[in-house]
């Protein structure tokens, strides 16, 4: 019995008579398919199997590109506009325990919130108007979380302690005006400052500022560290970096240190993982006890960065950070490594004694070896400054660079006990030019620097639009910094051009400070006091400790009467500090220094510039050139 076509077990297949009708349809099928399906590499099956990782990456790129465009179109000045789940703290906090800032909101019938100007791991910083004092302030709003509140209370205690010992606000520390609790958030009210030093570097396209401006910044920072090191304070900042050093005014070189959120007092250390990586000291990397000297290490790194435009040690991780330090300074002393708990993370013993850097996966491939990257080459001591950019400029002679190099090397001593102290740094020959300027007898304003300003002239507009926070930049990560430096020529706009090279802070007399609680450099501690503040080997006078006024002085006229120091009335004041009284040695610091020095001979005193060349390994610097300033 014949089975009709289209029936039976194989009825799904075309019969012989239908075969000829199907073939044309099959031939036409590719024409009907979408163009995207014709490429095997773009087929959905391949995208969801073999190329699944590529598919996810593409989705992420598209998502974050759209997110970035939205962020650029609507600047986040008001955190209430963000799509956050407002379910915490009765709807006042977001999912990250940060207060939801609303522009125009009024707190305590006193503070009118203007905008959000900074955010960090601690919380947020807003700009606000104080209707009671009729001034703009910066309010640091701590996260509504117990751990952050506890740490902020330590910061509050240290800030109040510093305020008690710096009632005239002349030691370059940010001034805490008051504090209060608002909707379960601790709020710290600070004076409103301007841009930070990283913004200043970005404004130079990361080519660095002049040696003259670097000197002014260094003198203020050394004075601030000397203040923090007084026995009554003994405060370790623990996170000194360009982002935490702010200009008081965008047209002046007066600065203040901010963000004491990671700080502690000597003998009350809480954390082992401190300092931002680029500025982290060897003792912190190695896990040995640390003291106030870690801030001096950070300062040495900052000064080099401010002049060259790039970090001296820009490690991508701790192993890379140590390798970059070794490239410049060599292997740390053996006694220091033998006592370090984390020494074998970076180093290994040699069979015949001594230490060498471990070859690990984290060690970068272009590592050259100990001492192969000399500081004199980084600074361009004999080649006209970094990249030869300062060749022929006044104030950038080989003698100036020799003094600067010697000061930095003393700040970057491996052993904390051998590292120069703030008092020793202020007495260094690098500041002799500042002393000469301070004795200038010309008309008002003639004491301004004669060094040309690489930032050129000046400035425009106010600072209200892009003010940095007084809260600083908390945290110990440099990942974002590394990204910004690797893309430094493609970044956003910096602060407006300033003339802070030409306008130094008013130099006024101040009460002398005792040496830091941890003791001075060995050759300073056991010498007779220096009379009349004369710099050894130079005959120059030690400059009076500079002062940061609440309102910057005009470069061509004396400050107004309300800013004049009463000691200026009458005869010129005596700016020479009396011989410092011996500071009591803190037991922890004394034990640390005894353990770390290991019988090491003391450093020689700062030499005359004419003798610095041979001692630093430089040759060919004529005596007449080295002796000139």
Curated annotation (Swiss-Prot):
List of residues binding ATP: 117-125, 140, 190-193
GO CC list: chromosome; nucleolus; nucleoplasm
Keyword Cytoplasm assigned to the entry: answer is no
Q: Tell me which residues this entry annotates as catalytic.
A: 239 (proton acceptor)
Q: Where is this region: Interaction with RANBP9?
A: 480-520
Main localization is: nucleus
UniProt keywords (A-Z) are: ATP-binding, Chromosome, DNA damage, DNA repair, Kinase, Nucleotide-binding, Nucleus, Phosphoprotein, Serine/threonine-protein kinase, Transferase, Tyrosine-protein kinase
**Entry's EC annotation:** 2.7.12.1
Reactions catalysed according to its record:
L-seryl-[protein] + ATP = O-phospho-L-seryl-[protein] + ADP + H(+); L-threonyl-[protein] + ATP = O-phospho-L-threonyl-[protein] + ADP + H(+); L-tyrosyl-[protein] + ATP = O-phospho-L-tyrosyl-[protein] + ADP + H(+)
Motif Bipartite nuclear localization signal, per the record, lies over: 69-86
The enzyme class is: transferase
Q: Does the keyword Transcription apply?
A: no
Q: Where is the composition biased (Low complexity)?
A: 438-477
Biased region (Pro residues) positions are: 552-562, 574-585
Q: Which domain of life is it from?
A: Eukaryota
> Where is the stretch described as Disordered?
67-86, 380-399, 436-480, 496-629
Under the heading Pfam families, the entry gives: Pkinase
What sections of the protein cross the membrane?
none
Tissue pattern of expression reads:
Isoform 1 and isoform 2 are broadly expressed. Isoform 3 seems specific for skeletal muscle (at protein level).
Give the family per the record: Belongs to the protein kinase superfamily. CMGC Ser/Thr protein kinase family. MNB/DYRK subfamily.
Q: How does it assemble?
A: Dimer. Interacts with DCOHM, MAP2K3/MKK3, RANBP9 and TCF1/HNF1A. Part of a complex consisting of RANBP9, RAN, DYRK1B and COPS5. Interacts with DCAF7. Interacts with RNF169.
* Name of the protein: Dual specificity tyrosine-phosphorylation-regulated kinase 1B
Recorded name of the encoding gene? Dyrk1b
């Amino acid at each position: 019995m014949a089975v009709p076509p289209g029936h039976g077990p194989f009825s799904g297949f075309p019969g012989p008579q239908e075969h000829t009708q199907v073939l044309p349809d099959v031939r036409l099928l590719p024409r009907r398919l979408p163009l995207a399906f014709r490429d095997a590499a773009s087929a959905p099956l391949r995208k969801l199997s073999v190329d699944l990782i590529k598919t996810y990456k593409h989705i992420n790129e598209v998502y974050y590109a759209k997110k970035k465009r939205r962020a650029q179109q609507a600047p986040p000045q008001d955190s209430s506009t963000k799509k956050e789940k407002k379910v915490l703290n009765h709807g006042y906090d977001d999912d990250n325990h940060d207060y939801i800032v609303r522009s125009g909101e009024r707190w305590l019938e006193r503070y009118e919130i203007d905008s959000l100007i900074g955010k960090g791991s601690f919380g947020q910083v807003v700009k606000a108007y104080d209707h009671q004092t009729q001034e703009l302030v910066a309010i640091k709003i701590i996260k509504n979380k117990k751990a952050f509140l506890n740490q902020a209370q330590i910061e509050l205690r240290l800030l109040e302690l510093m305020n008690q010992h710096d009632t005239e606000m002349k030691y370059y520390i940010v001034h805490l005006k008051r504090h209060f609790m608002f909707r379960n958030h601790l709020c710290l009210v600070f004076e409103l400052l301007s841009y930070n030093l990283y913004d200043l570097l970005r404004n130079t396209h990361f080519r660095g500022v002049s040696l003259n401006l670097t000197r002014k910044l260094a003198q203020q920072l050394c004075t601030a560290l000397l203040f923090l090191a007084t026995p009554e304070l003994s405060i370790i900042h623990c996170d000194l970096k360009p982002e935490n050093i702010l200009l008081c005014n965008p047209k002046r070189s007066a600065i203040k240190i901010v963000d004491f959120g990671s700080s502690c007092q000597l003998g009350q250390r809480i954390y082992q993982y401190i300092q931002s990586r680029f500025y982290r000291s060897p003792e912190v990397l190695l896990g040995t006890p640390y003291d106030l000297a870690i801030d001096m290490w950070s300062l040495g790194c900052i000064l080099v960065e401010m002049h060259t435009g790039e970090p001296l040690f820009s490690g991508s991780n701790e192993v890379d950070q140590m390798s970059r330090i070794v490239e410049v300074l060599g292997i740390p002393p053996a006694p220091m490594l033998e006592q370090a708990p984390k020494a074998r993370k970076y180093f290994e013993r040699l069979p015949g004694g001594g230490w060498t850097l471990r070859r690990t996966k984290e060690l970068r491939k272009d590592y050259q070896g100990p001492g192969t990257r000399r500081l004199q080459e980084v600074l361009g001591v004999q080649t006209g400054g970094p990249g030869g950019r300062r060749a022929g400029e006044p104030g950038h002679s080989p003698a100036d660079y020799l003094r600067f190099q010697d000061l930095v090397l003393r700040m970057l001593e491996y052993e904390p006990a051998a590292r120069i102290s703030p008092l020793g740094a202020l007495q260094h020959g690098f500041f002799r030019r500042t002393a000469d300027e301070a004795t200038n007898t010309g008309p008002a304003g003639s004491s301004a620097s004669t060094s040309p300003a690489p930032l050129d002239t000046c400035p425009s507009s106010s600072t209200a639009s892009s003010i940095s926070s007084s809260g600083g930049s908390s945290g110990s990560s440099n990942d974002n910094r590394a990204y910004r430096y690797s893309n430094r020529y493609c970044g956003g706009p910096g602060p407006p051009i300033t003339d802070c090279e030409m306008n130094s802070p008013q130099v006024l007399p101040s009460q002398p400070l005792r040496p830091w609680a941890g003791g001075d450099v060995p050759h300073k501690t056991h010498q007779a006091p220096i009379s009349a503040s004369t710099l050894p080997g130079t005959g120059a006078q030690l400059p009076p400790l500079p002062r940061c006024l609440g309102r910057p002085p005009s470069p061509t006229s004396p400050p107004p009467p309300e800013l004049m120091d009463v000691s200026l009335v009458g005869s010129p004041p005596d700016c020479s500090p009396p011989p410092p009284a011996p500071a009591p040695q803190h037991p922890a610091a004394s034990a640390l220094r005894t353990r770390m020095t290991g019988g090491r001979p003391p450093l020689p005193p700062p030499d005359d510039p004419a003798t610095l060349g041979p001692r630093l390994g430089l040759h060919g610097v004529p005596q007449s050139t080295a002796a000139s300033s």
